[in-house]
């Protein structure tokens, strides 16, 4: 807020370090307030702001300045003087990305050479992140807990983090509290990765019907050695029940909602630094069995995190004159062919249980609307009044060429994230769309990167994404019209139950 800081006239990180030793010696609140007031004064004269606007009364989110109201009169007056004459337009530390309006956190030193930052830099990490979220996160109001209480809660964790791993885990827990699947430790988490285990299982597992189920082999040739069948349910690892492990690990797996957290836990739950783990599992004969499961180094397996990458064609005709399209491999040049080849089909199934390889909301979405149809509007933050978020106008899908007359069924699940969710919103605007499946990842909106001391790299959803009526998609995800989830029985039989349901919907007169 302070114009001198906004101009880049102070290295704000180092100013904190210069101030902290004096601050920690304050004997009481009165001493403390005097120190803060004299610190603010030392930054230089603040000219009266002639173009500072008050918060828009229709703003979707308003700056949370309640903490100022709780200060002593003298300190309150000083801080409000800064706020009322705050920096406008260009800012050294934060801007808004052109065209989109998500925050661009500039000139924040990542201090990458310190793998384990000292106490001062760990505090800086906490303060930097807390403020970025407080003023520039569009979904602060959707958190389960009060963000204002988080500083005091995390101070001991950051101060007492005794090594690199504890510092990384403290950061992950803080990041997890904003409940945004885009927000995780995307870089610099080397010790966390080691802690999860360097050896991997030969099988892919997923949580299905609240149980940990074997769904695939990474390498077919290891099938016999693994001694597990597709559909086997793993109930214990090294003697510990799966639900207990999930409970312990949850705080280290940031996510917008529970299905997405389980998605991410399942990718790591069988990892270990040992060469084998002991598992208890139940096969389809309902017998409980125990075995040692051999683990492998990552590079010796054809490992995938969410789904096996396919190189195949993105569209095909199914029986009964039904078109099928997967966005996993869709190319720009496929779109005109899909429109011409599928125009007379009974229905089209679009599979977005993946991350789209091409951006299609408008190019393909226009095939399903008979007139220009609004499908989304955004909330954007404001560098001139940090903490204020206002709605943009709705964005419409134009109707172009011939409109498809059949039924459109869209498949989604917890693998549908970000652009996949945005694309689902576009298809939902269609004349005759049914979305089926289960809770999506609940993280939409262009991402903003955040660098923290120690070279930690994280991100946030930087704009709010809403339906035209204002309904939110963050955390709740894209709510399907018909909920369909895979079953253990279906996995054992090799069925795609969502696809089967989609076909049934299309064939129903």
Predicted regions and their residues:
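Cationic-aromatic interfacial patches
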Residues: 1-106
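Cleft-lining beta-strand/loop regions that shape enzyme active-site pockets
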Residues: 1-11, 16, 20-27, 119, ...
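Short amphipathic alpha-helical coiled-coil/interface segments
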Residues: 13-20, 32-43, 79, 126, ...
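PDZ/PDZ-like domain segments forming the peptide/carboxylate-binding groove
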Residues: 61-98, 114-132, 193-244, 332, ...
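Conserved PDZ fold ligand-binding element
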Residues: 129, 225-257, 349-351, 427, ...
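Short, conserved phosphate-binding/catalytic loop or strand-edge motifs used
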Residues: 145-153, 245-252
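C-terminal structured "cap/appendage" subdomains that terminate the fold
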Residues: 432, 442, 447-488
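Low-complexity, Gly/Ser/Thr/Pro-rich intrinsically disordered linker/tail segments
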Residues: 482-509
């Amino acid at each position: 807020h302070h114009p001198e800081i906004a101009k880049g006239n102070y290295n704000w990180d180092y100013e904190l370090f210069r101030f902290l030793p004096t601050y920690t010696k304050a004997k009481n609140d009165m001493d403390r307030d005097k120190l803060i007031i004299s610190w603010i004064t030392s930054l230089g004269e603040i000219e009266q702001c002639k173009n500072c606007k008050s918060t828009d009364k229709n703003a979707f989110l308003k700056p949370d300045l309640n903490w100022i109201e709780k200060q002593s009169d003298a300190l309150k007056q000083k801080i409000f003087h800064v706020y009322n004459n705050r920096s406008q337009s260009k800012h050294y530390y934060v801007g808004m990305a052109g065209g989109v309006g998500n925050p661009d956190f500039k000139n924040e030193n990542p201090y990458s050479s310190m793998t384990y930052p000292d106490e001062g830099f760990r505090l800086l990490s906490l303060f930097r992140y807390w403020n970025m979220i407080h003023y520039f996160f569009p979904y602060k109001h959707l958190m389960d807990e009060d963000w204002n209480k988080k500083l005091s809660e995390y101070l001991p964790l950051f101060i007492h983090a005794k090594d690199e791993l504890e510092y990384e885990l403290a950061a992950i827990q803080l990041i997890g509290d904003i409940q945004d699947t885009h927000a995780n430790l995307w870089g610099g988490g080397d010790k966390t990765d080691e802690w999860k285990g360097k050896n991997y299982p030969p099988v892919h597992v997923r949580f299905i019907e609240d149980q940990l189920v074997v769904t695939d082999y990474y390498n077919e040739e290891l099938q016999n050695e693994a001694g597990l069948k597709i559909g086997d349910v793993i109930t214990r690892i090294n003697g510990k029940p799966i639900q207990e492990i999930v409970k312990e690990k949850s705080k280290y797996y940031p996510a917008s909602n529970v299905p997405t957290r389980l998605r991410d836990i399942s990718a790591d739950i069988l990892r270990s630094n040992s060469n084998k783990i002991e598992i208890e599992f139940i096969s389809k004969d309902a017998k409980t069995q125990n075995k040692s499961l051999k683990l492998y180094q990552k590079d010796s397996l054809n490992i995938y995190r969410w789904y096996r990458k396919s190189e195949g064609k993105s569209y095909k005709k199914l029986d009964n004159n039904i078109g099928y399209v997967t966005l996993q491999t869709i190319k720009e040049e496929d779109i005109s062919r899909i429109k011409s080849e599928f125009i007379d089909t009974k229905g089209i199934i679009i599979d977005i249980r993946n991350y789209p390889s091409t951006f299609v909301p408008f190019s393909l979405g226009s095939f399903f609307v008979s007139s220009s149809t609004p499908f989304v509007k955004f909330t954007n933050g404001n560098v001139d009044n940090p903490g204020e978020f206002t709605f943009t106008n709705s964005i419409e899908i134009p109707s172009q060429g011939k409109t498809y007359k059949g039924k459109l069924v869209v498949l989604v699940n917890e693998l549908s994230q970000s652009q996949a969710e945005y694309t689902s919103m576009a298809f939902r605007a269609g004349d005759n769309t049914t979305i089926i499946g289960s809770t999506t990842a609940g993280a939409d909106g262009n991402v903003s990167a955040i660098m923290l001391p120690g070279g930690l790299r994280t991100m946030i959803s930087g704009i709010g994404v809403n339906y035209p009526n204002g309904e939110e998609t963050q955390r709740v995800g894209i709510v399907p019209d018909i909920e369909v989830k895979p079953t253990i029985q279906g996995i054992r039989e090799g069925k795609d139950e969502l696809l089967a349901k989609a076909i049934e919907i299309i064939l129903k007169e």
